[in-house]
Amino acid sequence: ILPVDQGFEHGPARSFAKNEDGYDPHYHFKLAINAGLSAFAAPLGMLEAGADTFAGQIPLIMKVNSSNSLSREKYSPSQAITGSVSEAIRLGCSAIGFTIYPGSDAALDMISDIQDMALEAKSAGLAVVVWSYPRGGDISKEGETAIDIVAYAAHMAALVGAHIIKVKPPTSHIELEEAKKVYIDENILIDTLSNRIKH
């Protein structure tokens, strides 16, 4: 899946200035198609710019929530709803995509939002993709990719009904003291990336 929501998240210059073709939404459609990828995920406006032109050439995933780097959300990172199931259907999308931030003070609201949208999407025959990226609250920077935290984030995404889940590759760091004892006592293998992914 080629996800292109960087312009929303980080602004156009930081996202596309090194490759000016990236300013053109059609460039990203073509990149995903020519690379033989499984799908192209983007926010509403980018999909609207090319959905008709590239109809039927690659499955589309509408990213229905987004954040931006202008807001101050160190402890309570969140995302705004920026798309809808009806807009995804109108553009011929195969799925909706949603980001949650487990650990954020806003996480419970985000989980409620995706659960409601997932029900609507599934009722319309669309798949649900969840990007589950722990951050905020009491999670340290190292903890954002800790095995126990990433596993928890993936589990939460599965429990809200995601068909496809994206997490960052976990490190062998264990963030929570309560979890450390379980990993040791149960001899959970986390020595290699392969074992951590399997977990």
Regions from the PLM with identified roles:
Residues 5-199:
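Alpha/beta enzyme core
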